[in-house]
């Protein structure tokens, strides 16, 4: 058996309910998101630019292949989760990029989640109408 020489970085990113697993390996710029191309899965240019921002800091975007598995949450949550996973994968490849990635906010996990609904209320914070008399 021959040993596989392709080095691969695997990282996970999360945002709200969205979870993204990113595999970064050397290649020719092929990006696969849940079996689709990046343009098919994320049709807006703003979303694609947000996802690829950590990779653009490396310089050459076309020298890496990405395999992304993302599930849960909404589209924007999936975008931010994928960006965090990609930034962590880039950090595994080049540890000297940590300060630059951190200063741009790419390594920061947004801890905000949906607040649970409380009993005796309509929603998490909204109450029923109160009448004094």
Swiss-Prot record:
Record flagged with keyword Ribonucleoprotein: yes
Region (Disordered): 97-133
Swiss-Prot/TrEMBL GO biological process terms: translation
GO CC, any one term: cytosolic small ribosomal subunit
Claim: Lipid metabolism is one of the keywords in the record: no
Pfam families tied to this protein: Ribosomal_S9
SUPFAM superfamilies cross-referenced by the UniProt entry: Ribosomal protein S5 domain 2-like
Any one GO MF annotation of this record: structural constituent of ribosome
Biased composition (Basic residues): 114-133
Entry-linked InterPro entries: Ribosomal_Su5_D2-typ_SF, Ribosomal_uS9, Ribosomal_uS9_bac/plastid, Ribosomal_uS9_CS, Ribsml_uS5_D2-typ_fold_subgr
Keywords: Ribonucleoprotein, Ribosomal protein
Database matches in PROSITE patterns: RIBOSOMAL_S9
Similarity-based family: Belongs to the universal ribosomal protein uS9 family.
Protein name from the UniProt record: Small ribosomal subunit protein uS9
Source species: Chlamydia muridarum (strain MoPn / Nigg)
